[in-house]
Design a protein with these regions (language model features):
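Short, well-structured alpha-helical segments in soluble
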Residues: 12-26
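Venus flytrap/periplasmic-binding-protein-like
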Residues: 38, 42-65
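Periplasmic-binding protein-like
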Residues: 24-35, 53-56
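Short beta-strand elements in bilobed, periplasmic/extracellular small-molecule ligand-binding domains
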Residues: 1-10
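Hinge/cleft segment of the Venus flytrap/periplasmic-binding protein
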Residues: 86-129
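Hydrophobic alpha-helical segments within soluble ligand-binding/sensing domains
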Residues: 71-92
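Glycine-rich, charge-decorated loop segments at or immediately adjacent to ligand/cofactor-binding or catalytic sites
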Residues: 13-15, 61-70
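Solvent-exposed loop/turn segments at secondary-structure junctions
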Residues: 9-12, 32-36, 59-62
Length: 129
């Protein structure tokens, strides 16, 4: 069962993270600016509770996550630019243009995985730094 938790700012992040950690075996945090700026709050709650956090992107994973299927903001921007060119040149109709996806990179946070005693499957790259 998946449960959604919401917070409006960094002031609520601590209590919401605590509630989520208390009620779940693992957490998924999508790409979110508030979490990205406050990964220490999430890590300070989830790691001592032995609750793995799976992150929506590498920056959050580096701060509080165990693993991510990370997007490349460069690749995403490049693909978006290519789509914009097609629209501006009249080669595509924005209302019928299909959504395009970029590849993801499998990455993990060795320190947190080690602290939680997790073995990472083959095919994941260690997050540097």
């Amino acid at each position: 069962t998946a449960t959604q938790y919401a917070f409006s700012d960094s002031n609520a992040l601590s209590s919401v993270s605590q509630e989520a950690a208390d009620e779940n075996d693992a957490l998924y945090v999508p790409t979110d600016n508030t979490v990205a700026a406050n990964t220490g709050i999430v890590d300070g709650i989830c790691r001592p509770a032995k609750k793995p956090v799976f992150a929506g992107e590498e920056g959050i994973c580096a701060g509080c996550g165990v693993a991510t299927l990370s997007i490349s903001y460069y690749d995403l921007g490049y693909t978006t630019g290519e789509m914009a060119v097609k629209i501006l040149n009249g080669e595509a109709d924005i209302s019928t243009m299909p959504i395009e996806y970029t590849d993801v990179t499998k990455k993990y946070n060795k320190t947190i995985c080690d602290d939680l005693g997790l073995t990472v499957p083959d095919g994941y790259e260690e997050i540097e730094g």
